[in-house]
Design a protein with these regions (language model features):
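Membrane-embedded alpha-helical bundles of multi-pass enzymes
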Residues: 3-225, 278
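Soluble catalytic regions of membrane-associated enzymes that act on cell-envelope
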Residues: 224-344
Length: 344
């Protein structure tokens, strides 16, 4: 059998490592819309973790994350951004996979430290980078947050109101990496790997127990919050308004502000005719601040339809940072403070 610390492994193991890495990417892709197999996110990383640390040679270990990111983010981001934003965003998933191949070099560290930091590094590294890109990297921002795959599961996501989506992301990654370490420990015991190269089974059992408790506490809290919701709460009909123009407003020279307002007004009246009381617009629906332009027209529309309107817009002004914001317009004509998606 091959030595885990050498750069050579049998061809069969290498191929299996590649296939398992691709499997992880496929599971992650299926966990997100439009497929919506949300439960796959809770163990999707496990095949790639096993491939990275037990099947692929050390020098090519980063091929595992590169492959699952390619299979997952390649089609996911291409579908999200389409061709409108240019080839950079269309093929962004490919670029991320290439960068990952050169960045995921932690295998040597985990071998030298007996894998005692595997779970901590996996969870903190992943969620920490999510925080960084959400705060400092526009456009990409929160795209493909692992917790978003759970959006349809009301029974599971209620603690997000307490711990934010990052809390949910941490629990999902903790489950994945704990299961991954469990598979590594099982494999080491089965193969009889030397203690210096093997995962500590005692540490793994402790992590399995701790992760089980965290998951139990999360689910129990979620069910408790959901169960405490009012049984006779009023039902409010909400409409999502999309203008369906091919370009964002700051790039669109055909559909002017007036055209966009008129289209929105027509769709708003149509939605109200179907019983909507709250209207949401998609990101960057308008290219003007509703508190500064078309203000009276929008106020009259809100009063006429007796609806609450969440108005999203993007403003580009020379010498100023781009504003990507949303304001709430109430039926009485009052505007809320702007919510800044770009954290300005």
């Amino acid at each position: 059998k091959s030595d885990l610390k050498t750069s050579k492994v049998p061809a069969g193991r290498f191929v299996l490592g590649v296939l398992l890495s691709i499997l992880s990417g496929g599971l992650l892709l299926l966990a997100f819309p439009p497929y919506g197999l949300w439960f796959l996110a809770w163990f999707a990383f496990v095949p790639a973790i096993f491939a990275q640390y037990r099947l692929l040679p050390r020098k090519q270990a980063s091929l595992a994350p590169a492959l699952y990111l390619l299979v997952w983010l390649g089609p996911y981001l291409a579908r999200l951004f389409g061709n409108v934003a240019g080839p950079f965003f269309t093929y962004l998933g490919v670029l991320i996979a290439i960068i990952a191949y050169f960045m995921y070099t932690e295998r040597v560290f985990h071998e030298r430290t007996g894998y005692r930091w595997l779970i901590v590094q996996g969870v903190v590294g992943w969620v920490g980078f999510e925080m960084v890109r959400a705060t400092f990297i526009p456009v990409i921002a929160t795209s493909a947050f692992i917790g978003y795959s759970q959006a349809s599961q009301a029974w599971l996501i209620q603690p997000v109101s307490l711990f934010s989506v990052y809390g949910l992301n941490m629990v999902i990654l903790m489950v994945n990496y704990t299961l991954g370490q469990g598979v590594l420990a099982w494999y080491d015991k089965r193969r009889g790997n030397p203690a210096a190269e093997a995962v500590d089974p005692g540490s793994t059992r402790k992590w399995l127990l701790a992760t089980s408790l965290v998951l139990f506490a999360w689910v129990a809290t979620s069910l408790g919050i959901l169960g405490s919701a009012p049984r006779d709460a009023p039902t409010v009909r909400v409409a999502a308004i999309r203008l369906n123009y091919p370009l964002p407003p700051h790039q669109d020279e055909v559909n002017t502000s007036q055209v966009r307002f008129e289209r929105f007004a027509a769709l708003a009246r149509q939605a109200v005719g179907q019983g909507a009381q709250v209207l949401f617009t998609s990101e960057m629906t308008f290219n003007f601040d509703p508190r500064e332009e078309y203000t009276e027209e929008l106020r009259l529309l809100a009063t006429e339809t007796d609806t609450y309107m969440f108005l999203s817009y993007s403003v580009l002004a020379e010498g100023q940072p781009r504003r990507n914001q949303t304001v709430l317009l109430s039926p009485d004509g009052s505007f809320s403070e702007a919510y800044n998606k770009t954290h300005l």
